[in-house]
């Protein structure tokens, strides 16, 4: 998602984390991300040959008023429904929000930081893989939520390290 455009566009293929991951690995990567997507109530339909599900949601839930604990509870509910083995699931907590057009309060920033700890504990509880994108120096756009093009590249580079 490119927040610079009026209706929200997309960065070029060379700048999107999903496309960078596919290019660098040769893997078939299915991007199920949607602008504004919140944690679903039920597990997504996955292809039968899914090797790895990388799950990174929660920011929009926090923006819509969920507490970090409520968002983590929603994650637990959906992740518990998956028919994948624990080592086939990688939960990535989004980087913390920053002051910006979509982030009018310090409380949202604090909640996004608290959410990271909730997700870490959830991953341990479920025995699934975990990564904290807050540790990856991801640059965020003026809205305080979405990645810049450089942020996408940094995310992809760090994710590749986690997956190696």
Question: Can you name each region flagged by the protein language model?
Answer:
Residues 38-73, 96-97:
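Oxyanion-hole/transition-state-stabilizing segment in secreted/luminal serine hydrolases
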Residues 31-33, 93, 132-134:
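Residue-level recognition of beta-strand->loop/alpha-helix junctions
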Residues 68-77, 108-116:
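Charged helix-capping and loop-helix junction motifs
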Residues 1-33, 43-49, 153:
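Serine-esterase "nucleophile elbow" of acetyl-processing enzymes
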Residues 17, 29, 129, 141-164:
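Histidine-centered active-site loop/cap adjacent to the catalytic His
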Residues 84-89, 128:
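A short helix->loop->beta-strand "cap" motif at the edges of active sites that frequently abuts
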Residues 5-10, 34, 65-69, 103-107, ...:
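Short, solvent-exposed loop/turn segments at secondary-structure boundaries
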Residues 97-134:
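Substrate-gating cap/lid alpha-helix
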């Amino acid at each position: 998602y490119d927040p610079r455009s009026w209706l929200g566009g997309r960065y070029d293929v060379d700048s999107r984390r999903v496309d960078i991951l596919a290019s660098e690995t040769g893997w078939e990567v299915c991007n199920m991300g949607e602008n504004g997507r919140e944690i679903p109530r039920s597990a997504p339909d996955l292809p039968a040959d899914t090797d790895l599900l990388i799950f990174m949601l929660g920011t929009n839930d926090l923006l819509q008023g969920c507490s970090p604990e409520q968002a983590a509870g929603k994650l637990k509910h959906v992740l518990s429904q998956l028919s994948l083995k624990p080592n086939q699931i990688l939960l990535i907590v989004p980087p913390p929000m920053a002051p910006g057009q979509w982030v009018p309060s310090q409380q949202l920033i604090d909640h996004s930081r608290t959410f990271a700890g909730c997700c870490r504990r959830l991953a341990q509880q479920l025995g699934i893989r975990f990564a904290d994108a807050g540790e990856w120096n991801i640059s965020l756009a003026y809205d305080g939520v979405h990645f810049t093009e450089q942020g996408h590249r940094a995310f992809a580079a760090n994710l590749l390290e986690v997956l190696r």
